[in-house]
């Protein structure tokens, strides 16, 4: 019997969610930072995909990791905590704050939360969960 080659590190799914597409667009901007406002799963799913193009993207890509209560009642506290740390430790050329599917459903005003944080750098905010489409739709949304 012939030896079979294994391709275990190959991801055959080429259409990830819109959150990943938007993060990929901003990941291509020098010194841009990205915050995925959503569950840890969404962050790691996108991170795994983005690492293929930029193995050091985790330095510029963060997740808020809201708990179950926040996903129901709002992620403002989680997002403000992440934004405060970012403001103290970094100076990005631009910041993307994007909501995942679950957080998009509760209707948090992430642009309002970003204004409350008084960030000293340009900030772009939008919902980019998979409910709006796949990778391509997220990339197009980010490019607007």
What does each of the following model-derived ranges do?
Residues 1-144:
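An N-terminal assembly and electron-transfer interface module characteristic of large anaerobic redox
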